[in-house]
């Protein structure tokens, strides 16, 4: 009986060590992992430029969040729900660089826009996720307004 328990326990340890979480990286304490990136919502309202600067100071490669899929949008929306401030918007890393442009050609992290989720009639200036759409749709808001935000960075493996 003792041998059976010992062997069973040994097999359980081997199974758990091999199964893992599917992630080959660890995010710092307080950060959440999704698809090879670390994310964290911040309650301290900042304007868009200051929020982007703050994110870049948190970790190498840190920026305001870029959103590249429906799955990532859902994940970020869940993080946004954790923000304590009752603000209508939270910043994301998308901003029009010139008044003549309809939309920015890239996110603040330099990645191309391959996924869009504009709220109806919105596609200009600084973008935020709006509480009215459960933080799933993107809306324009004044770049100087102070809003909570979500940072994202690729961890070093």
Curated annotation (Swiss-Prot):
Tissue and organ expression note: Expressed by the venom gland.
Chief localisation class: secreted
Superkingdom as given in the UniProt entry: Eukaryota
S-S pairs: 27-38, 55-151, 126-143
Endpoints of the signal sequence: 1-23
GO cellular component: extracellular region
Coiled coil segments of this chain: none
Subcellular location: Secreted
Record key words, sorted: Disulfide bond, Hemostasis impairing toxin, Secreted, Signal, Toxin
Pfam family, one: Lectin_C
One function term, GO molecular function aspect: toxin activity
Keyword set includes Secreted: yes
Annotated ranges, domain C-type lectin: 34-152
Function: Interferes with one step of hemostasis (modulation of platelet aggregation, or coagulation cascade, for example).
Subunit structure: Heteromultimer; disulfide-linked.
Family: Belongs to the snaclec family.
Protein name per Swiss-Prot or TrEMBL: C-type lectin 9a
Source species of the chain: Crotalus adamanteus
